[in-house]
Amino acid sequence: MAKELVVYFSVYGTAKIVAEEIAKQTGADIAEIEPVVPYDSNRDHYNALARLAKKEHDEDQRPLIKNEIDIAAYDRIYIGYPMWWYTFPMILYTFFDKYDFSGKIIIPFNTHMGSGDGGTYDTIRKLEPKATVLTGLPVEMLDAENGPAKAVEKWLKSLH
């Protein structure tokens, strides 16, 4: 049986909610991508976070990751993130640059406020051509906050 890991990056906690649900339903291990410099998780400061995210994207920054994640020990890796400026946060580029996904199965999921996956699943396929990238799960932010169990269950069944 394939060893599974759910890896996620989340500032406001919505991607974390989905990640925890996936781990619960699959029995996968779970790990958070933690930035060296934490992002402000106060939703009242959303505009400041949005400006920072845009600046990172425009300047092609690669925020550093604080923790190590043992990707090599896993065959199937669920990777989750919020959408920022219609793409994934730049720390995900750091993550894909840092680890070798050759021969792995990547299963993306994301939270959003109306942009779906924004083409990020195709971006992952381009960044990781030696991995197999399966159909992802875009979850609208309010659906994540209200409980994604049914959507996750349906999606997981579609993968098998």
Positions of the model-derived regions?
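Extracytoplasmic/periplasmic soluble domains downstream of a signal peptide or transmembrane helix
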Residues: K3-E4, A31, G119-Y121, L134
